[in-house]
Amino acid sequence: MIPSHTAPSPFFPWSHRMNTAPECRTPPLSLARAEVRQLPVYNAGLSEDAVRAKYGIPRITKLGSNENPYGPSPAALEHWTEIASSLFRYPDASAEGLREELSRQTGIDTDRIVIGNGSEQIIRMICEAFLSPGDRLVTVLPSFGLHLIWPQMMGARAEAIPMTADARFDLPQLHQAVTSDPLKVLMFSNPSNPVGCLMTGDAMQSLIDACPADTLIVIDEAYWEYARSSPDYADSLTILKNQSRPWMVLRTFSKAYGLAGLRVGYALTSDPGLTAVMTRVRDPFNSNSAALEMARLSLLDQEHMHKTVGATLAEGKALKAALEERGYFVAQSFANFLFFNARESASALAERLLEQGVIVKPWKEKGYETWIRVSIARPEDSQAFLAALDRVRQPSHSSAA
């Protein structure tokens, strides 16, 4: 662990007195826009250090953030010292090197690629660039939280269509939603986060065709590397590239490439004009130089990525079977996580797991308060989770239903 210091800094001798400043007479929240005052706070999950400090547990099993436990490409890491030696320079604001490699691998021209500080920033940029107060966005429920939060920040109406009872896309309801009122943006993740299910190619094509011609289609493919080997996976780029409508496909280096700590995401767009609009709201140096180069080098090591994805998918099958043996309904997943119905308060169960040193993510959206998302990691992490689960789950759930 990197050491930290709590003593006052000799460079800022007043720093130890800052907590004695008089309280502001104007409530800070009153200064915020109405949309911001009503904005929910995104739950980014707990860190290992926070759990360790609260419960005094030395070993933490972190299964709440869908990280790749196998880490970045070793071949990319060999260049880390070289990368670090130039950190005194500003990064390339155009991210040209990374965009060129992405173009080579995806077939999308560089002027149709946008780089972001994680795909979260890309989602925010989309909302800032294209949503006005009163505009309507349709997504699904449960969903990645920022699909709802960022539209609300812009004063847009975010309408979330619940999944079916068996945790699949409710296609009839989605069709009704995209045709009932004017629609500015359709945004959903595929594979779904947090459920993990896939939308088939025919279903995706039908849903897109049902949208108004000027609706921006945004497909968040943060977990596509885990799904693309499945015969059920529909290549969104193949479906979208022949569409004469605006679209974006979002992807990230945080999951399969193991670069969550560096924050690199990207958007593939239908038109250079969309890229130009996004550039208007993009911070000039929004991605740091280490992140850009590590992402580029990681793309060159597809063998490592495929190896870690394969190990994750194999472990996912074993973990899903183990949860089902314990009587839980587990949604079909094509990602590096599982979504299961705990049949009790997910928050309460997650808290008891924390006391055992295991971090999972309880869902809190209405209608899903008994569901938990657990990341698929190494076999030993799964075993630690299952052992803790067996110790703390309610007696009525101790045998298969």
Curated annotation (Swiss-Prot):
PROSITE patterns: AA_TRANSFER_CLASS_2. Pathway: Amino-acid biosynthesis; L-histidine biosynthesis; L-histidine from 5-phospho-alpha-D-ribose 1-diphosphate: step 7/9. GO terms for molecular function: histidinol-phosphate transaminase activity; pyridoxal phosphate binding. GO terms for biological process: L-histidine biosynthetic process. Keywords: Amino-acid biosynthesis, Aminotransferase, Histidine biosynthesis, Pyridoxal phosphate, Transferase. Gene3D superfamilies: Aspartate Aminotransferase, domain 1, Type I PLP-dependent aspartate aminotransferase-like (Major domain). It holds the Pfam family Aminotran_1_2. The modification N6-(pyridoxal phosphate)lysine is found at K255. It is an enzyme of class 2 (transferase). Its cofactor is pyridoxal 5'-phosphate. Its EC number is 2.6.1.9. It catalyses: L-histidinol phosphate + 2-oxoglutarate = 3-(imidazol-4-yl)-2-oxopropyl phosphate + L-glutamate. Belongs to the class-II pyridoxal-phosphate-dependent aminotransferase family. Histidinol-phosphate aminotransferase subfamily. Homodimer. This is Histidinol-phosphate aminotransferase 1. It comes from Gluconobacter oxydans (strain 621H) (Gluconobacter suboxydans).
